[in-house]
From Swiss-Prot:
Residues 411-426 have a biased composition (Low complexity). Residues 1-114, 407-433, 533-616 are annotated as: Disordered. The modification Phosphoserine is found at S71, S412, S416. GO terms for molecular function: cis-regulatory region sequence-specific DNA binding; DNA binding; DNA-binding transcription factor activity; DNA-binding transcription factor activity, RNA polymerase II-specific; DNA-binding transcription repressor activity; DNA-binding transcription repressor activity, RNA polymerase II-specific; identical protein binding; RNA polymerase II cis-regulatory region sequence-specific DNA binding. It comes from the Eukaryota. Keywords: Activator, Cell cycle, DNA-binding, Nucleus, Phosphoprotein, Repressor, Transcription, Transcription regulation. It comes from Rattus norvegicus. This is Transcription factor E2F8. Residues 542-554 have a biased composition (Polar residues). It is found in: Nucleus.
Amino acid sequence: MENQKENLFSEPHKRGLVKSPLQESSKANVVLAEIQPDLGPLTTPTKPKEVSQGEPWTPTANLKMLISAVSPEIRSRDQKRGLSDNRSGLPEARDCLHEPQAKTNEKSQPSRKEKSLGLLCHKFLARYPKYPNPAVNNDICLDEVAEELDVERRRIYDIVNVLESLHMVSRLAKNRYTWHGRHNLTKTLGTLKSVGEENKYAEQIMMIKRKEHEQEFDFIKSCGLEDHHVIKSTAGQNGHSDMCFVELPGVEFRAASANSRKDKSLRVMSQKFVMLFLVSTPQIVSLEIAAKILIGEDHVEDLDKSKFKTKIRRLYDIANVLSSLDLIKKVHVTEERGRKPAFKWTGPEISPNNSGSSPVMPLTASLEAEQSAKENCAKNLFSTRGKPSFTRHPSLIKLVKSIENDRRKISSAPSSPVKSSKAESSQNSPPVPNKMAQLAAICKMQLEEQSSEPRKRVKVNLTRSGHYKPLAPLDPAVNTELELLAPSLIQPLGMVPLIPSPLSSAVPVILPQAPSGPSYAIYLQPAQAQMLTPPHGLSPTVCPTQSSNATGSKDPTDAPTEKTATDATKPGSLQPAPERQGAKNRSKETTGDRGTKRTGALEDGGPGPIKKPKEDLKALENVPTPTTLFPSGYLIPLTQCPSLGPDPMLSNTENSGTLSPNHRIYGSPIAGVIPVASSELTAVNFPPFHVTPLKLMVSPTSMAAVPVGNSPALSSSHPAPTQNPSSAIVNFTLQHLGLISPGVQMSASPGPGAGTVPLSPRVEADNLSSRQGRATIHDSPVLGQSQLNGQPVAGTGAQQPVPVTPKGSQLVAESFFRTPGGPTKPTSSSFMDFDGANKTSFGTLFVPQRKLEVSTEDVH
């Protein structure tokens, strides 16, 4: 159909005369038959039927027949000879087909002898002179040589590698070498002999021969594990895997990639093979011994048969090239087990003393001097006069990799627990407490025992109180919102309260409960400001900070940086009950001895330093900032006061001593008030309640720690006089703050006690105003100070150049608050009156109702 379509397309004028397909196809065949004699190569011979009748004699003849049937060249050649000659007979036809193919195969494929490496090496060496002229270009192009010799280039590479091991050629670039000839051959052989002696190849050869004579086993069994260990011990460091390519100092490779090719197996094996001949006493080496030394018994055991045979073939290739160089000659060693192939050295004799080259002599001396692991490297085999060729052995690469892996493992390993514990201990150590944060830690540790919500709120307020912010003057219209704005309350520069309270209903409580013995000081923190208006119009001033007292700093500006609080981990922060009982017993002694006893108790109770009177006076004079003192509530045992920290917990003993040499009083080491700038006096009103003459049951030892509201500095000139709060309000507040237990009741109204005289703040203020004519402010944040033996003592303000001691004498009123669980002893009551002159508005105090119990102790 295709022919029909082609005919129709090629001859459109005959479309009307189209005949049947059979007639068209027969007509096309006739046309092809007419053209066939002209197309000789394309015709199919008529011989295949006759040839197929006979069977080929061999598989090779059959393959040739198939090739002749397919190949168009064979068909055309047969066609030229004539088709008639093919019909004469099958044998003649087969001979005609076999003879030309055999001739072409002989021309294309050389014989086995012609392909031998030895003959090829002879042809290669015949192209170049033995001693070339260095001034002439002696470059060799391997591609050109392979083409001229009609061999593969890899065969030329085998020859060149062996010649390069003897430094007869040197590599220039890819497929390009420089011919050196035999100029350096003697020098090279001398160097190789010295290296072979260093490697103790002669001893290895003798050992292997002795083992072979002793044992009558085959090749593998004759060198068992014993030989393996001996050979490994002698040649393990100098064996094939640990030896570098030996170079001459005068023949350096100029190509950049030369160093990467220096550890080729054929070149290194060739040098070691030559060493065996040079060091052996009868310079005859069999391939068996050479294989054991060069390849190694461990490699023989590890490698399979094919790989081992490949190594043996490489030795044969090296031997063929060396034979072409007339350095060795093949001989046969006759032994009991038969003949073995061996080679005898026929090259130049190299003596160990004069190895034919001057550089070898200093080399041996340097090798003897330096017995190190680098003696196997090529650069140690030559003098340093020439340019050193640095090579890196594969073993060094493995060593570097192992070191890098070890470093990676060490760096990625987690830190040891010892280091972490040390780090933790260093972090937990209190080198510089962070201001009020350590006091917060104390409260937190004590409050963990309490599960009630109010104490949790106390801890929250305690942590909030560590930030100091300036308090903007508040509008009287927003007095009810003061509690929300309380976190902005700040001390003036140089003022450090014990805990800057945010004026919330929750008060930080230190040691809310104690099982036994010690005296406690209770500090009330109402949410109101107690105004301090000194008489005669003198503006109240604030005492220097506790940090200034503790450190003896003269500059009040250094106080914020020097403020440190107590650390919960200090040993003296929590004293056992015996020490507390001791403090109680000491408090019952005479009044004259009480000062020194109290000083010893404070010094023994903790590490808080006692400041000097001169430093205190200087600190008093350096802080002129006027403030308003806010009473704040705390419950702190007096024996713990000096141990709570040097800054806010400093005792007032020495300060009091400076005020009155004759009367030593011991003020509170605890800050009981919160100072506020005097510019904010008129803008602060606190709704819950205010401090009025409040009677607290106290012990003698706790007298100095109670904030007394009847300070001479307090004036009754406030425009809004205060009211005395009822006992219920005080009890509510104390219970809500966790300062007292429900079973303890506290009186808030003034009343006489046995052997005590309540201090009248008004009378005291008027008395001091009339006598002194100046205001006195305490040098600690404690709102008031106690009086011992009827001697009232007032703190001095910054405006006073000299401290003033009141001349009036009154009985000492020591206040003490007994926590639940402490020892109680019903004795005559002593009271401390809080000032009730200043009147402020009351606010609603939402606190739970609890029962209060108050126990007293004898003052004397």
